[in-house]
Swiss-Prot record:
GO terms for cellular component: cytosol. It comes from the Bacteria. GO terms for biological process: dTDP biosynthetic process; dTTP biosynthetic process; dUDP biosynthetic process. It holds the Pfam family Thymidylate_kin. Keywords: ATP-binding, Kinase, Nucleotide biosynthesis, Nucleotide-binding, Transferase. Belongs to the thymidylate kinase family. GO terms for molecular function: ATP binding; dTMP kinase activity. ATP binds at G10, P11, D12, G13, A14, G15, K16, S17. This is Thymidylate kinase. Phosphorylation of dTMP to form dTDP in both de novo and salvage pathways of dTTP synthesis. It catalyses: dTMP + ATP = dTDP + ADP. It comes from Lactobacillus helveticus (strain DPC 4571). InterPro entries: P-loop_NTPase, Thymidylate_kin-like_dom, Thymidylate_kinase. The lineage of its organism: Bacteria, Bacillati, Bacillota, Bacilli, Lactobacillales. Its EC number is 2.7.4.9.
C-alpha cells in the first residue's frame, strides 16, 4: 500500500516548522501508519549539503538558474533516497516545503517562470506531487518581521532578500495554489498557533480519516 504525502508551504516566517512539530506532538501517537518528518531543501545527507550552499549568505552572486537547479538536485536526491522509499513502505511523509516552494521562489520570485521550474522539478522528482498541501498564508512583511525577532542577524540568503522579492514569492504561492485547488488547503497563519494547529488536524481527520 502506498503511503500519504503531506507538504507544508508558505512564505518565510509563516511558522511551517513550528506548526508541523505541534501537529505531530498531538496526533503522532494516534496515527495508524508510521510517519516520517522531513524538510526541503535537505532531508538527506547529500541534500543537506546542497542546502548549505543554497542558503549561505556568502553566496550572494548565485545565478537564478543555478539556484533553481540546486533546489531540484537536492530534491531529486531527497525523493529517491528518503521520500519514495517511505511512501512505498506505506508511511505518511510530512515535508516542510516541496516543489511548490520552487515554483513560488524561483518561478515567480526569480522570474524564471512557474511552468519552466515545474518542468525541471518534474524531471527531478519523476512528477511526484503531495496528496495534500497546507498553505500557511501570511503577508511577507509579517513573516519577515517574525524571523527578524526570532533570529536577529541570522537570516539565510533568501530571507535576506528585499521585500519586493518576497512579495513576488507570495504572489507566486497564490498562483500555485490556484493551479492545484484539489490538494491545497489555505490556513490563516496570523492566527494563534493553537488555532492553526487545530485546523490542520481537523483537515487531516476529514481528508485522510483512514490514517487515524
Amino acid at each position: 500500500m502506498r503511503g500519504y504525502f503531506v507538504s507544508f508551504e508558505g512564505p518565510d516566517g509563516a511558522g511551517k516548522s513550528t506548526v508541523l512539530k505541534e501537529v505531530l506532538d498531538q496526533i503522532g501517537p494516534k496515527l495508524k501508519p508510521q510517519y516520517l518528518v522531513t524538510r526541503e531543501p535537505g532531508g538527506s545527507k547529500i541534500a543537506e549539503k546542497i542546502r548549505d550552499i543554497i542558503l549561505d549568505p556568502a553566496n550572494d552572486k548565485m545565478d537564478a538558474k543555478t539556484e533553481a537547479l540546486l533546489y531540484a538536485a537536492a530534491r531529486s536526491q531527497h525523493v529517491e533516497e528518503i521520500i519514495r522509499p517511505a511512501l512505498s513502505e506505506g508511511k505518511i511523509v510530512f515535508s516542510d516545503r516541496f516543489v511548490d516552494s520552487s515554483l513560488a521562489y524561483q518561478g515567480e520570485g526569480r522570474d524564471l517562470g512557474i511552468e519552466e521550474v515545474k518542468q525541471i522539478n518534474d524531471f527531478a522528482t519523476g512528477k511526484l506531487d503531495p496528496d495534500l498541501t497546507f498553505f500557511l498564508d501570511i503577508a511577507p512583511e509579517i513573516g519577515l518581521s517574525r524571523i527578524q525577532k526570532l533570529r536577529p542577524g541570522q537570516e539565510d540568503r533568501l530571507e535576506q532578500e528585499n521585500i519586493a522579492f518576497h512579495k513576488k514569492v507570495y504572489n507566486g504561492f497564490l498562483k500555485v495554489k490556484d493551479l492545484y485547488p484539489d490538494r491545497f488547503v489555505t490556513i490563516d497563519a496570523t492566527q494563534p498557533i493553537e488555532d492553526v494547529v487545530n485546523q490542520v488536524i481537523a483537515t487531516l481527520e476529514k481528508r485522510l480519516p483512514e490514517i487515524f
